[in-house]
Design a protein with these regions (language model features):
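Intrinsically disordered, low-complexity segments enriched in small/polar residues
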Residues: 8-13, 105, 200-202
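A recognition module on extended beta-rich or small alphabeta surfaces enriched in W/G with H and D/E
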Residues: 2, 123-206
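Generic structural signal for hydrophobic core residues of well-folded globular domains
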Residues: 76, 101, 105-106, 139-143, ...
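N-terminal low-complexity, intrinsically disordered segments
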Residues: 3-91
Length: 214
């Protein structure tokens, strides 16, 4: 695999640029996340290369760029029909990129050891985990991928709350249902709902680490 692109000032180790306003200092410093595991960073860089090569546009790790990843997935679906093995190259790269966008947006940590099936993203401020690579595989195949853990792992006591929230979301067609942007919107709704519930129940200051998910 080719080496990662050089990091810019303010990058987080995955090639993502951390926003910084040189004119106005924030009142409080946001949580600083460590760089992702090297296995993840390499795949993020690969996704950036794939998209830049095809569309001549650079991904920057922000949620706004997921619409471009959606288009890449649509083309990957066509390639998958002709060459099913292509999913083993594309899904890990797209999953790593999507997972890293979510990690930066919502504060989470990677478990990226062993096979890609075992990878997880563990959230810090809510009890939530899943496998972003599994989400990427389902985006390509447009069906549930058994054993890839793309489903949401939640506190059982909060499952009904989240089921109700997801049931209230607008319907989307099959093409959009599995796309990265739709998945990001779902995770946003889940995180916001769980945070509101935690604040209302007086547990808003509780955080989670990887050990809490064992």
């Amino acid at each position: 695999m080719a080496s990662d692109p050089p990091q810019q000032n303010g990058s987080n180790g995955a090639g993502f640029h951390e926003p910084h306003d040189s004119q106005t200092e924030p009142e409080s410093e946001p949580e600083t996340l460590p760089a992702p595991p090297s296995e993840v960073a390499e795949l993020v860089a690969a996704c950036m290369r794939f998209v830049a090569s095809k569309y001549k546009v650079a991904l920057d790790g922000t949620p706004d760029t997921l619409s471009l990843v959606d288009q890449y997935i649509r083309e990957a679906r066509i390639a998958y029909q002709a060459r099913p093995e292509s999913i083993d190259l594309v899904a890990p790269a797209v999953g790593a990129y999507l997972g890293e966008v979510m990690r930066q947006e919502f504060a989470a940590e990677w478990f990226a050891e062993g096979s890609h099936e075992a990878w997880r993203l563990y959230f810090h401020n809510v009890f939530l985990s899943f496998n972003p690579v599994g989400i990427a595989r389902e985006a390509i195949t447009m069906k549930d991928e058994a054993g890839w853990n793309a489903h949401l792992t939640l506190d059982p006591a909060e499952r009904e709350l989240i089921d109700e929230r997801l049931a209230a979301m607008p319907d989307v067609d099959e093409d959009e249902y599995y796309l990265p942007t739709t998945r990001f919107d779902v995770i946003t709704a889940v995180v916001e709902t769980l945070r509101a519930h935690a604040e209302a129940s007086g547990t808003g200051d509780v955080t989670f680490s990887r050990e809490d998910y064992d």
